[in-house]
Amino acid sequence: MATVVAFHAHPDDETLLTGGTLAKLSAAGHRTVIVVATDGHMADLDGRKPLRLGELAASAAALGVHRVVHLGYADSGHGAVLYADPPDRMRFARADPEEAAGRLAAILREEHAEILLSYDRNGGYGHRDHVRVHQVGKRAAELAGVSRVLDATLPREGYTRLVRSLERLRVPFRYDPSVLASLFSPRSAITHRIDVAAQAAQRKTALAAHRSIVEGSSRFATIAKVLLRLPTPILARVMHWEWFAEEGATPGSGAPLDDIFLPAPR
């Protein structure tokens, strides 16, 4: 059996991008580990236990994940302003990439990881912490000698259609059309498409674990509320697939593979 490490920016990111794949791997007997760069909090915790890390632990348990590790950073936020660091920790966007990569590499070595799941170079929807996850993840794999890095992503063309459909339904989910052209990855870059329909119930439970976010008013909360209202069989159809782009693979080299342990052509 293999060990797969999924590197994420914030608690809740694991549910939509890799939740089904992690649940599927765990059920098959593989060891799965989530490493989260930030605790998801912007402010000073003043000695309090990070609420969102507790939610992540519940989400990971629903997915069957064996271990969760926090790298120790604070959320950097997604707005135009990068705020000052809280007194007790550094924002991930300000962290020295080499130091952060060293922390992640130590975990990869300890776990004897065979595959690292990370993010695409655009950071998906462009959050500064997601972009940094791509940079740090790629470097950590080099340091730890992990030869295969799969970037969790979405096919840009499908995501664009989804956003436009939501706008037509008057769901408050807006993107500048010029920004849509640089989100996630073009379909030609997708190397793996994993069928996770059977993991819909686990993903739903994992998503619901992030109550502090689901009950909010963010873009993620808008998506989460819609998904959680769906009956599980419908959710299985909506969230049927998870997509990955393998680092170093030849773009457009054929139909996406259906198993992350199958290497993409280089």
Role assignments for model-derived ranges:
Residues 1-112, 139-143:
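Active-site rim/loop-helix segments in enzyme catalytic domains that contact anionic ligands
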Residues 1-5, 83-84, 94-266:
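Metal-dependent de-N-acetylase/amidase catalytic core
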